[in-house]
């Protein structure tokens, strides 16, 4: 049995908790968030995007009870002061978005956790290894990897298709665009935004060009693609589900039909459950609460010639990503002898 704690009970933290509650190999032993337990229980039970939780949720003064299991809640600003050791937490999911360097994430280890999984790109990629399930997760080293990053939701969508493309046809270079659902960092109406003026515009009113490191980060899990991919984002007024558009040149002359065939083979074989394949006339909300990292849309891509193509792949940027957090932890726990 893998015992986990969650630091930061926002969109990802709550969905990781839902998925953990449904997995008999995982038990949730503690939550840390500055929000009171009564509000955390409410937000866990009712979800505007993924629907209400199917079990029972009751708020207590010092925690929440989910399906008759009491889970203590804490409100510590400094992770080093959390009682992870006393709770027996094997792993901690760091999902505040704040502690993404080695020095800050290490505080969970000082508090007694054995491993830390950051649910975001790391700001110390040279110290903290990045893993994408289905691509390089088996490279986890139980002796050295105490803090790891699960990359971003977009990298989790991009990396599997980039791997299949590079393995089969070779990628010379490529440009990625993610059309990304709005997130909690965006304001509902126009307001100030210190680093990114456009990012301060109303999320529900605008298509907003933005930066993303997701394409470059793919090289952290596929080193052979270093310097070959970059990308940008459009934030759009939808609540959930995003889509990657990858335009690329191939080393090997091929056809769009051959690319689709390679994706279908991978989706039904080595990447089953991670990569999906569809030829249906689908739209974004058809993928709400889809547990896969990336769903290749055969009908949406195009080819210009035998070496220049565009492929399209969908992802539930909340649920699919949260599923991979659990999957990565279970892979690590297997190597650590915990499950």
UniProtKB/Swiss-Prot annotation:
The record marks 180 as: Activates thiol group during catalysis. It is found in: Cytoplasm. D-glyceraldehyde 3-phosphate binds at residues 152-154, 183, 212-213, 235. Disulfide bonds: none annotated. Keywords: Cytoplasm, Glycolysis, NAD, Nucleotide-binding, Oxidoreductase. One of its GO terms (cellular component) is cytoplasm. This is Glyceraldehyde-3-phosphate dehydrogenase 1. It comes from Synechocystis sp. (strain ATCC 27184 / PCC 6803 / Kazusa).
